[in-house]
């Protein structure tokens, strides 16, 4: 999964390591 590079995606990567790309777009 393409993980977006950004400080806001750091905590999301811990919760959704395999879906951090949709998690960031989902919360934002």
Swiss-Prot record:
Belongs to the bombesin/neuromedin-B/ranatensin family. Stimulates the release of gastrin and other gastrointestinal hormones. The modification Methionine amide is found at residue 28. This is Gastrin-releasing peptide. InterPro entries: Bombesin (IPR000874). It is found in: Secreted; Cytoplasmic vesicle, Secretory vesicle lumen. Keywords: Amidation, Cytoplasmic vesicle, Secreted. It holds the Pfam family Bombesin. One of its GO terms (cellular component) is secretory granule lumen. The gene is GRP. One of its GO terms (biological process) is neuropeptide signaling pathway.
């Amino acid at each position: 999964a393409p993980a977006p590079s950004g400080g806001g995606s750091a905590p999301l990567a811990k919760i959704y390591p395999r879906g951090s790309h949709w998690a960031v777009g989902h919360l934002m």
